[in-house]
C-alpha cells in the first residue's frame, strides 16, 4: 500500500497508508483530517480540497483538466504546486507523495 504524507496548515505531518484507486482527497478524509473541507465530495466543483503537491512528483501526476485549472484560478493561494486533491488518484508510483493542505480562501 502506498503511503501519503499530509502536512496540515499548522505544519503537523501525518503518514497515511493509502488504498490505490482512491483520490488523495478520499484518503485524507478517511484518515479523519478534517482540515480539508472537500465540500462537493470530490466532484471537481468547489476547490475546497486544494493542496500543494511536492514538485518531485509532478511527472507522475495526471495533467490538470480545464475545470481543475479554472477552479484553482479562484484561489488567492494558488501557486505552481497547486492541485485539487479530488483529481489525484493514488497509485503505487505515488508512494511517499507529500501534500500540504492549502490555506482557506
From Swiss-Prot:
Q: Which GO terms describe its molecular function?
A: 2 iron, 2 sulfur cluster binding; electron transfer activity; metal ion binding
Residues at which [2Fe-2S] cluster binds: 40, 46, 49, 86
Q: Which UniProt keywords apply?
A: 2Fe-2S, Electron transport, Iron, Iron-sulfur, Metal-binding, Transport
Organism's domain of life? Bacteria
Q: Which family does it belong to?
A: Belongs to the adrenodoxin/putidaredoxin family.
Describe cofactor binding as the record notes it. Binds 1 [2Fe-2S] cluster.
Q: Please indicate if the UniProt record lists Nucleotidyltransferase as a keyword.
A: no
- GO terms classed as biological process: P450-containing electron transport chain
What are the 2Fe-2S ferredoxin-type domain coordinates in residue numbering?
2-105
Protein purpose: Component of the chloroacetanilide N-alkylformylase multicomponent enzyme system involved in the degradation of chloroacetanilide herbicides (N-alkoxyalkyl-N-chloroacetyl-substituted aniline derivatives). In vitro, functions as an intermediate electron transfer protein.
**What protein am I looking at?**
Chloroacetanilide N-alkylformylase 2, ferredoxin component
Cofactor annotation: [2Fe-2S] cluster
Q: How does it assemble?
A: The chloroacetanilide N-alkylformylase multicomponent enzyme system is composed of an oxygenase component (CndA) and an electron transfer component formed by a ferredoxin reductase (CndC1) and a ferredoxin (CndB1). In vitro, chloroacetanilide N-alkylformylase assays in which CndB1 is substituted for CndB2 demonstrate that the two enzymes possess nearly identical activities.
Amino acid at each position: 500500500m502506498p503511503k501519503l504524507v499530509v502536512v496540515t496548515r499548522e505544519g503537523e505531518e501525518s503518514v497515511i497508508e493509502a488504498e490505490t484507486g482512491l483520490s488523495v482527497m478520499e484518503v485524507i478524509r478517511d484518515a479523519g483530517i478534517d482540515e480539508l473541507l472537500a465540500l462537493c465530495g470530490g466532484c471537481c466543483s468547489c476547490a475546497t480540497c486544494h493542496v500543494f503537491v511536492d514538485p518531485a512528483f509532478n511527472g507522475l501526476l495526471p495533467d490538470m483538466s480545464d475545470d481543475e485549472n479554472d477552479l484553482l484560478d479562484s484561489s488567492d493561494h494558488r501557486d505552481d504546486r497547486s492541485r485539487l486533491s479530488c483529481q489525484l488518484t493514488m497509485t503505487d508510483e505515488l508512494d511517499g507523495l507529500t501534500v500540504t493542505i492549502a490555506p482557506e480562501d
